[in-house]
Amino acid sequence: MIQRLGSSLVKFKSKIAGAIWRNLDDKLTEVVSLKDFGAKGDGKTNDQDAVNAAMASGKRIDGAGATYKVSSLPDMERFYNTRFVWERLAGQPLYYVSKGFINGELYKITDNPYYNAWPQDKAFVYENVIYAPYMGSDRHGVSRLHVSWVKSGDDGQTWSTPEWLTDMHPDYPTVNYHCMSMGVCRNRLFAMIETRTLAKNELTNCALWDRPMSRSLHLTGGITKAANQRYATIHVPDHGLFVGDFVNFSNSAVTGVSGDMKVATVIDKDNFTVLTPNQQTSDLNNAGKNWHMGTSFHKSPWRKTDLGLIPRVTEVHSFATIDNNGFVMGYHQGDVAPREVGLFYFPDAFNSPSNYVRRQIPSEYEPDAAEPCIKYYDGVLYLITRGTRGDRLGSSLHRSRDIGQTWESLRFPHNVHHTTLPFAKVGDDLIMFGSERAENEWEAGAPDDRYKASYPRTFYARLNVNNWNADDIEWVNITDQIYQGDIVNSSVGVGSVVVKDSFIYYIFGGENHFNPMTYGDNKDKDPFKGHGHPTDIYCYKMQIANDNRVSRKFTYGATPGQAIPTFMGTDGIRNIPAPLYFSDNIVTEDTKVGHLTLKASTSANIRSEMQMEGEYGFIGKSVPKDKPTGQRLIICGGEGTSSSSGAQITLHGSNSSNAKRITYNGNEHLFQGAPIMPAVDNQFAAGGPSNRFTTIYLGSDPVTTSDADHKYGISSINTKVLKAWSRVGFKQYGLNSEAERNLDSIHFGVLAQDIVAAFEAEGLDAIKYGIVSFEEGRYGVRYSEVLILEAAYTRHRLDKLEEMYATNKIS
């Protein structure tokens, strides 16, 4: 509604309820346009004066989506929907965009003390999930390195906890694993796993590892099982599975094909078998039945194909799927001249994973080029290299319609790209991304300032593949000022690009300027000391097409529950404040714990459990509330508490039903290097009445202490004892315990009951004399005393005979 108030005054009022009359001039100057100040906005005419005048107005400035050439960059926060072109170095134009010109957001997708870097050109989308592989270590190199990834199932808004894909190399710390090339072909993840030395990061071996990705299939028919057979045949087109891979079945309608199973044999690319626990008398076929099958990445083994030390290779980079059977990986050689850049083509990775073809880009582009990024679209292979020096051009773009046998090539003008240029094809455009290692490094001739605190820039560019001309390519600065927690960033690592729905994702690594390779607070290079190495992975998400969904954005309002709170102690070591409760299995490595209480209910007799890699300890320090008499510690060399899994020692607590008992359980008990002795002299027995040894094997006679200083009541043997002994006869017999073991040995000895009866006949108590024992309802004898008494009795009789000869009582 407009009202004429005079010849020069115009007022208006909005139709919105409650609105008032306003001066039209006031309304028009709320947001000013650069065009109001004479700017051309054609990207060629210098609009610096118009920009200065607009900024002097103090108003917010709308660029109306145009590009304005300037001789110095203005305050970008004052502008909306504006792009500037500025030549910081003459002849090297760069473009800078304000809010509203590009719809993009930056996310930090890892946050831990490891040196998280190298996501180069190996990110991918599988089953609507974005996978961002990278490597996490404790420094630049392979020290404590794990090949890892994070995943996002919500379009990059939240990311998973990092998952390790490799353990330490068996020969660590001499060598360790490393990976710069990874991707999915059909339904398997393929990765070039390099082995490198810790000392020099030198490549010593290459191996192609592959493993099925996790997925869920809803199928109809295709399972058969013949009568009187345990094997069932599964038909799944292009299953991509190998022997030993994990599969899970439900609702199969075929006996035995259910739950977790493993691939038994592979018939062809569409059929495999599983071994069921049973067989039936008739043929089975689930034709027409709906059923489900799942595969698992983590539960399946790696298939590892050793490729040895590939000659003329510094690193293998990037990955591009060619078809359902093969893929390519890029590589470069920069250790010795001449430099080499190219690809490895694996035409049949499923059946012949060790077979590959090596191809190079044109030789004139190889000097000072490195780390190729590779993609394959519609029968065309694209490859982009990065430059390695600031004084010479190195970045180049190549395409091939015959997988690297012939090439069409372009050189990027002006700019030197010290990081890789990952890309994706959207429509007819290649959309490329790259980040500086240090602020103002993008242009040719820039110094190497990686180890200074700065604000490295991130750029993107479009190149139309139909025009195939890089002379007028526009590098657009989309974000900078990356931070690593509390420290300004310096270096930015190599990246990956993927497209999902209406968005393109640039995933790249940042780096703390206190680079652990050289200097800084953390000279020990320990990721768990101080703040570790705040080197993390970022994702820049940019909209590239209209999205027909109502909204795919949300605010993450949940309380984070996947991380343990830590605090920096006064000693520079991160601390977890006690108490801390764990409700599931705990796996630790190089852990120092002052006091640890574990509570678990693994069985009725076990209060607490501690599980270590390859060894087990079950702890019952405190009295178990559910069963106090079960207090004990079990140490088992096997994989459980049962002695059948390995040798075992059980230590009973004072409240145990077998208080303070130690039980040893094993096939052998061997002692090495020292004598076996009791802690206290002459206090304890070896064995007991109900815990007897079958026999003892000795190398010599045992020694029994017979020192007179250790005896009392010394006298000659009573003649009544000798007379009683004369009543004891020697016997031969078999042993019941041996008969139970099907042994039939004849033994010689005395019977304890005969000794007791003989002594009683002379009015003596055999138990008192110690030659006979009676404990726990069982008689025993001391054969050393039996022999002594027999010898004494024999001597006694001989003495009597000699006396009779001497007195002529016998002759």
Curated annotation (Swiss-Prot):
The keyword Hydrolase applies. Its EC number is 3.2.1.129. It is an enzyme of class 3 (hydrolase). The keyword Repeat applies. Residues 706-808 form the Peptidase S74 domain. Belongs to the glycosyl hydrolase 58 family. This is Tail spike protein. One of its GO terms (biological process) is symbiont entry into host cell via disruption of host cell envelope. It comes from the Viruses. The active site is at 371, 386, 437. The record marks 332, 335, 339, 368, 388-389 as: Binding to sialic acid. The record marks 706-707 as: Cleavage. GO terms for molecular function: endo-alpha-(2,8)-sialidase activity. Pfam families: End_beta_barrel, End_beta_propel, End_N_terminal, End_tail_spike, Peptidase_S74. Changing residue 138 to A: Greatly reduced enzyme activity. Keywords: Degradation of host capsule during virus entry, Degradation of host cell envelope components during virus entry, Glycosidase, Host-virus interaction, Hydrolase, Repeat, Viral attachment to host adhesion receptor, Viral attachment to host cell, Viral tail fiber protein, Viral tail protein, Virion, Virus entry into host cell. BNR repeats lie at residues 150-161, 286-293, 398-409. One of its GO terms (cellular component) is virus tail, fiber. It comes from Escherichia phage K1E (Bacteriophage K1E).
